[in-house]
Amino acid sequence: LEQKHIPVITAPAKVKRDETFLVTIEVGKYKAHPNEPGHFIEWIELYSGDTFLFRVSFAGSLSDPKVTIPIKLTHAHGPLKACEKCNLHGLWEGIKDIEVED
């Protein structure tokens, strides 16, 4: 169940302050998550520590639960934390450490 639901974060280990970089979050990277009308990922959120960065909502079986978004950080609030909601199995979380340099 975990391999289908844990949101996997792909991002650099180190970034420069106020410099844009790409973050990809993918659900089902290790084992495909069903994507059908009765079982799908509703949304993915990204946080830096406890600071909310964005939320992407998905249209049920019409879209894959993967998103790439450019972001920038002013300082390290903590690790990147992705949360996702499966309509059947609830909330799941993935974490990636990141360092913000001057």
Protein language model annotation of sequence segments:
Residues 72-77:
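Surface-exposed, short loops/turns at beta-strand junctions within beta-sandwich domains
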Residues 1-16:
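Short, compositionally biased P/S/T/A/G/V-rich stretches that sit at domain boundaries
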Residues 85-95:
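Short acidic/polar inter-strand loop motif in beta-rich domains
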Residues 26-36:
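Short amphipathic, basic-aromatic surface patches that mediate peripheral association
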Residues 65-69:
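Short strand-edge motifs at loop-to-beta-strand transitions and within beta-strands
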